[in-house]
């Protein structure tokens, strides 16, 4: 493990005597980066929650036309071996922010409508798949953040403040109750294991779960949210996105995370965390499960790059920088061509060993694929999909180029979760996987037409 402080460039006599054109670029400040205290509900945005990263407030109204797209007929759907002749597909979804529809660092109605489970349900012709939407009046939900200038070299954000759902303070904070039926049980910072064990009131998923389900506070009780789901839903197909949010949350523990933080279940019993998934699938239900993308493919981990400060060969142990207000100030003050000598605390640096711990391709993704094989699940290899998007080589079947950069069309302003277009791309990957595994014929979303129909602009 790296030492507490990492020097990106060793100080040498030649550096001290450098010319004016290469003056040392040493950044130090004593600023306290306060988190926005006006928010009773902790922000889902990894960086915009800091006041120093906000440039102001903005009022935003829904701009994408979901109903215009959703009202279109899909055509014939052949479910292949998903269900028997004459049987109906009844689908639920579990998981984290991707499945819940987190976008731009918030959970709000427009993001929920375009979440990939809702898009997949449309393509499957399922009219009874329900999302726990925020109300039409509280359409901005938890609130969210938009890039102040999407074309800027380094990001800052504006805070969306209008038509938000009222939050009651407490532990946990309380959001308005969703009164309808739901088929999507995913929550931000969530996974199916929290549907099994929901007794911790201080965990971030709780306010979102409590909107549409009743958390069971007695850990010794046989009751759980999963018990409620199984009692109230006769589902036979499940969308499972269980591990990505854990990966993102664990990355923020640097420099204190270990191999076990990411791969503890493999260390302990040689498999993925599966007890809740096993219970959800205990009647032989079919479905899909996602692999975990590598963090390097996210704009979140590319807002501030080592390569812009120094030649990577100068400090081969330093792999990635964790976004933070202090790091932002370093990049804003750094003068191209100057020598960079600022001392960085280890909390900002993901070194080569830590990066290897966090690589899901080494251990966890193979185990996800093994689990899928044993349980007759289709696999959406999100690791491979995000690698292609990151490399700039992803083009949809209808010829639409997908851009995974900060200035691109796939990721929203939180640098982690997709835009509406990105969710449609994920939905198509889900459909690819389902059709391949179960010999079904579910129509893909025509991305070019989707973009035109909903009025997406990026």
Segments from the language model and where they lie:
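Catalytic nucleophile-elbow at a beta strand-turn-alpha helix junction centered on a G-D-S/GDSL motif
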Residues: 88-105
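Conserved SGNH/GDSL esterase-like catalytic core that processes O-acyl groups on lipids
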Residues: 105-271, 447-448, 452-455
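Mobile gating loops/cap/lid regions near enzyme active sites that modulate substrate access
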Residues: 301-359, 366-417
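Positively charged n-region of N-terminal signal peptides that target proteins for export
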Residues: 1-4, 19-20
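A short helix->loop->beta-strand "cap" motif at the edges of active sites that frequently abuts
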Residues: 282-286
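Bacterial N-terminal signal peptides
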Residues: 6-14
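Histidine-centered active-site loop/cap adjacent to the catalytic His
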Residues: 31-32, 120, 360, 364, ...
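Bacterial Sec-dependent N-terminal signal peptides
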Residues: 13-82, 441-458
């Amino acid at each position: 493990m790296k030492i507490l402080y990492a020097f990106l460039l060793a100080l040498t006599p030649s550096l001290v005597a450098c010319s004016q054109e290469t003056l040392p670029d040493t950044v130090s400040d004593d600023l306290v980066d306060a988190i926005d205290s006006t928010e009773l509900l902790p922000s889902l945005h990894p960086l915009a929650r800091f006041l120093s990263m906000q440039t102001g407030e903005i009022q935003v109204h829904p701009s994408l036309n979901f109903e215009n797209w959703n009202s279109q007929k899909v055509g014939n759907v052949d479910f292949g071996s998903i269900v028997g002749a004459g049987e109906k597909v009844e689908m639920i979804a579990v998981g984290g922010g991707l499945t819940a529809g987190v976008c731009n660092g918030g959970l709000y109605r427009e993001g929920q409508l375009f979440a990939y489970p809702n898009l997949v349900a449309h393509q499957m012709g399922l009219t009874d798949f329900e999302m726990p939407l925020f109300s039409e009046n509280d359409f901005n939900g938890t609130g969210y953040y938009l890039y102040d200038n999407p074309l800027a070299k380094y990001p800052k954000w504006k805070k969306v403040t209008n038509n938000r759902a009222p939050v009651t303070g407490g532990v946990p904070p309380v959001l308005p109750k969703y009164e309808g039926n739901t088929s999507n049980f995913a929550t931000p910072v969530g996974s199916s294991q929290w549907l099994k064990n929901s007794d911790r009131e201080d965990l971030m998923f709780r306010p979102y779960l409590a909107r549409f389900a009743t958390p069971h506070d007695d850990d010794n009780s046989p009751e759980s949210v999963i018990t409620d789901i199984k009692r109230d839903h006769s589902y036979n197909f499940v969308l499972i996105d269980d591990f990505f949010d854990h990966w993102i949350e664990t990355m923020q523990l640097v420099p204190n995370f270990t191999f076990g933080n990411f791969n503890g279940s493999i260390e302990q019993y040689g498999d993925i965390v599966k007890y809740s998934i096993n219970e959800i699938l205990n009647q032989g239900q079919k479905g899909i499960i996602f692999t975990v993308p590598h963090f390097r493919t996210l704009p979140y981990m590319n807002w501030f790059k080592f390569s812009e400060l120094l030649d990577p060969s100068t400090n081969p142990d330093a792999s990635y920088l964790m976004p933070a207000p202090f790091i932002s100030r370093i990049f804003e003050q750094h003068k191209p061509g100057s020598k960079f000598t600022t001392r960085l605390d280890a909390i900002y640096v993901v070194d080569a060993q830590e990066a290897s711990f966090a690589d899901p391709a080494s251990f966890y993704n193979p185990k996800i694929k093994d689990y899928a094989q044993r349980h007759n699940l289709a696999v959406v290899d999100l690791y491979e999909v995000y690698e292609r998007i990151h490399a700039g080589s992803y083009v949809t079947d209808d010829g639409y180029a997908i851009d995974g950069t900060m200035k691109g069309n796939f990721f929203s302003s939180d640098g982690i979760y997709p835009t509406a277009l990105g969710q449609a791309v994920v939905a198509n990957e889900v459909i690819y996987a389902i059709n391949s595994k179960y010999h079904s014929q579910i129509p893909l979303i025509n991305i070019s037409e989707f973009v035109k129909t909903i009025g997406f602009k990026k």
